[in-house]
């Protein structure tokens, strides 16, 4: 059985894996933008921008509303909060593991008396 939360997290992390999409998220954090406005800083075609927008939409990070021919995009940060919670859940584990590794390295690098 597939857990829908993990499926959505997969989409979120996939969306965040691209620098262009992360930059689009940063722009959307300041407010609503058209797809053309999102594309402009990257000197990409409208078609390329639409592909990025669709990835963000699938991840639930972007909401799109259509007004006439214009597509307006806005940020939905809820999936980012879920991804952050997932990462935080493992933060203690990795911190403990790195502390143990540091301790081991200190012990093995001491000169013998």
Which residue ranges define each predicted feature?
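N-terminal helix-turn-helix DNA-binding core of bacterial DNA-binding proteins
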Residues: 2, 7-47, 70-85
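Conserved catalytic core of two-component sensor histidine kinases
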Residues: 50
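Amphipathic alpha-helical dimerization/coiled-coil segments
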Residues: 1-8, 26, 81-113
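Short, hydrophobic-biased segments on the C-terminal half of alpha helices
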Residues: 53-54
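Beta-hairpin "wing" of winged helix-turn-helix
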Residues: 57-68, 72-75
């Amino acid at each position: 059985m597939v857990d829908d939360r993990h499926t959505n997290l997969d989409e979120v992390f996939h969306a965040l894996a691209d620098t262009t999409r992360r930059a689009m998220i940063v722009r959307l954090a300041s407010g609503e933008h058209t797809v053309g406005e999102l594309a402009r800083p990257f000197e990409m075609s409208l078609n390329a921008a639409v592909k990025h927008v669709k990835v963000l939409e699938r991840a639930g990070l972007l909401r799109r509303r259509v007004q006439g021919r214009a597509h307006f995009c806005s940020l939905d940060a809820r999936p980012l909060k879920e991804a952050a919670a997932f990462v935080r859940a493992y933060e203690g584990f990795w911190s403990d593991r790195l502390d143990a590794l540091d301790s081991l390295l200190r012990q093995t690098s001491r000169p013998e008396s």
